[in-house]
């Protein structure tokens, strides 16, 4: 294993792991994908209608809906308060775990452990399900597991002269104690903090793992990966979660629901199930940025008995989203161990924006550290960490390279694995390294897909999902998209399909040098007030697509 000089390591950070910890003495942890919850649809034609909240509804939440709209300044102040409180909670958990050394607190994997424990402790529905399942298992003679507890793998520091190593230890907590500590620290139920953590984990999953199996299972081509943002977000992530999901993720949810309805024709006679299905489609419609796309969703909504034809329509819709990108909110989500360092970093602001300067400045001030798994390259690991924090899995690598001054590589060229260390790799004396990539320039985050202009692309991933609002050509593999356009458009909604295909072809015919986010510039990281706009310099020798020819392990193959 690699090791690290004590003097070369400072403060810490985290990254996100894909699973929620299953508690107990011998329970294995596995990714959780929840079925659709059954909340009534919103009639408001907002861009991102309020989704279902599995375990995050309360009287306080209901009261919040009646409050007057906050001003931008009030929002930034409340966000600052949230991230500071998350940091305080992390420090309290580390004290309870008996890990008081700065090295231990700065480690990404320790922050991961605290985040997973918090999510497991606050997921009442999952806990209830686990208890009922375990009660049945005990009757069958299986081992009894205490689901009132949850735990995680932490890493304790070991010093050896001028070298430090980390050794894994398993620590468990009572769920009620964790919940009480969190609510007391946050001063409320802290739903926004939980959502923030969930989005961070989802962004890390998008960067570290491919989702080819999940795409193929619903009949979508793996080249549509750029539309699949947020595919591991749990439903309890609420409105915020829907806003950060890609169009393909919502299409996949709808196709899975139709598959269930085809197997059980009585499913959509249940008003609750029908409401949940309509909610998914309404969310999908509001994601769409073109009238032709919305019209196609309307066709599916109007179908009395959803079936193969509707799946074909949704598949075409997902393909169109490669060219005309839907609205996907981008956020900077940092590990809570970085938030815990805000007082020491001298980050003295009263306001904080997850989509603007403050988040990027905080990222640059922090010095995150990660465990290195066997064969990991520290610089490559730093790229994974940067892309995780900024949700940049599907951003153009040329843009990221211009902002950081570091040449970014596609996933297949990176010599590193994800941040979660599987049990079989946890050994005594693991090395660590600084995550060294920093921003030289900054630009605001975006929530739109930019214009439908195209450039040259590669194989594998065939389009980008912009994260930074800075003028640039949008990378798009026209050849790959044209292959997808050769499909049958006959049937009940031939006109709707024809209009959508025409829109895609018109878009493809545009000049390749057209730019998205016209007039948007980047700024020096020291230029908080945007006084000196700078034209972005795109380096043509760097590949566009992170998942161009992917060799990453699939999320569904992980054994936690």
UniProtKB/Swiss-Prot annotation:
Residues 1-74 are annotated as: Disordered. GO terms for molecular function: RNA binding; structural molecule activity. One of its GO terms (biological process) is symbiont entry into host cell. GO terms for cellular component: helical viral capsid; host cell; host cell nucleus; ribonucleoprotein complex; viral nucleocapsid. InterPro entries: Flu_NP (IPR002141). Late in virus-infected cells, may be cleaved from a 56-kDa protein to a 53-kDa protein by a cellular caspase. This cleavage might be a marker for the onset of apoptosis in infected cells or have a specific function in virus host interaction. It comes from the Viruses. It holds the Pfam family Flu_NP. Encapsidates the negative strand viral RNA, protecting it from nucleases. The encapsidated genomic RNA is termed the ribonucleoprotein (RNP) and serves as template for transcription and replication. The RNP needs to be localized in the host nucleus to start an infectious cycle, but is too large to diffuse through the nuclear pore complex. NP comprises at least 2 nuclear localization signals that are responsible for the active RNP import into the nucleus through cellular importin alpha/beta pathway. Homomultimerizes to form the nucleocapsid. May bind host exportin-1/XPO1. Binds to viral genomic RNA. Protein-RNA contacts are mediated by a combination of electrostatic interactions between positively charged residues and the phosphate backbone and planar interactions between aromatic side chains and bases. Belongs to the influenza viruses nucleoprotein family. This is Nucleoprotein. It comes from Influenza B virus (strain B/Ann Arbor/1/1986). The lineage of its organism: Viruses, Riboviria, Orthornavirae, Negarnaviricota, Polyploviricotina. The gene is NP.
């Amino acid at each position: 294993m690699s090791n690290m000089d004590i003097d070369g390591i400072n403060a810490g950070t985290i990254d996100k792991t894909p699973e929620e910890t299953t508690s107990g003495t011998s329970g294995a942890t596995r990714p959780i994908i929840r079925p659709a919850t059954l909340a009534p649809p919103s009639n408001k034609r907002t861009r991102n209608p309020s989704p279902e909240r599995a375990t995050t509804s309360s009287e306080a939440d209901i009261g919040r809906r009646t409050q007057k709209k906050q001003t931008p300044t009030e929002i930034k102040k409340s966000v600052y308060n949230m991230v500071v409180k998350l940091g305080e909670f992390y420090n309290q958990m580390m004290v309870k775990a008996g890990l008081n050394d700065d090295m231990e607190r700065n480690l990404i994997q320790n922050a991961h452990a605290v985040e997973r424990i918090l999510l497991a402790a606050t997921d009442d529905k999952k806990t209830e399900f686990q208890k009922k399942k375990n009660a049945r298992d005990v009757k069958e003679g299986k081992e009894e597991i205490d689901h009132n507890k949850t735990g995680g793998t932490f890493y304790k520091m070991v010093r050896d002269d001028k070298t430090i190593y980390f050794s894994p230890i398993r620590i468990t907590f009572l769920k009620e104690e964790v919940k009480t500590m969190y609510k007391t620290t946050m001063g409320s139920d802290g739903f926004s903090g939980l959502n923030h953590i969930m989005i961070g984990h989802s962004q890390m999953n998008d960067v570290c793992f491919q989702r080819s199996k999940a795409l193929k299972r619903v009949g979508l081509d793996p080249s549509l990966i750029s539309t699949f943002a947020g595919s591991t977000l749990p439903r309890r992530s609420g409105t915020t979660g829907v806003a950060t999901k890609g169009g393909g993720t919502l299409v996949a949810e709808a196709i899975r629901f139709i598959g269930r309805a085809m197997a059980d024709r009585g499913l959509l006679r249940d008003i609750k199930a029908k409401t949940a299905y309509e909610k998914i489609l309404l969310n999908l419609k509001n994601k769409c940025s073109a009238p032709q796309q919305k019209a196609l969703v309307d066709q599916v909504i109007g179908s009395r008995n959803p079936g193969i034809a509707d799946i074909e329509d949704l598949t075409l819709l997902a393909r169109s989203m490669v060219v005309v990108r839907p609205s996907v909110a981008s956020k900077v989500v940092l590990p809570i161990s970085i938030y815990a360092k805000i007082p020491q970093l001298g980050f003295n602001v009263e306001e904080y924006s997850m989509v603007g300067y403050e988040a990027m400045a905080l990222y640059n001030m922090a010095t995150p550290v990660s465990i290195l798994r066997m064969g990991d390259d520290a610089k490559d690991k730093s790229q994974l960490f940067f892309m995780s924090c900024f949700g940049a899995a599907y951003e153009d690598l040329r843009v990221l390279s211009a902002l950081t001054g570091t040449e970014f590589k596609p996933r297949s060229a990176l010599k590193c694995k994800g941040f979660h260390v599987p049990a079989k790799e946890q050994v005594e004396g693991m090395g660590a390294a600084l995550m060294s990539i920093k921003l030289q320039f900054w630009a605001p985050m975006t929530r739109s897909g930019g214009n439908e202009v195209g450039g040259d692309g590669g194989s594998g991933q065939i389009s980008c999902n912009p994260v930074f609002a800075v003028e640039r050509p949008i990378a798009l593999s026209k050849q790959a998209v044209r292959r997808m356009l050769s499909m049958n458009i006959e049937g009940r909604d031939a006109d709707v399909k024809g209009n959508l295909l025409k829109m895609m072809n018109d878009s493809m015919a545009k000049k390749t040098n057209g730019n998205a986010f016209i007039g948007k510039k980047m700024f020096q990281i020291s230029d908080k007030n945007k006084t000196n706009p700078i034209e972005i310099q795109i380096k043509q020798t760097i590949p566009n697509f992170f998942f161009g020819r992917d060799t990453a392990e699939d999320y569904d193959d992980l054994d936690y």
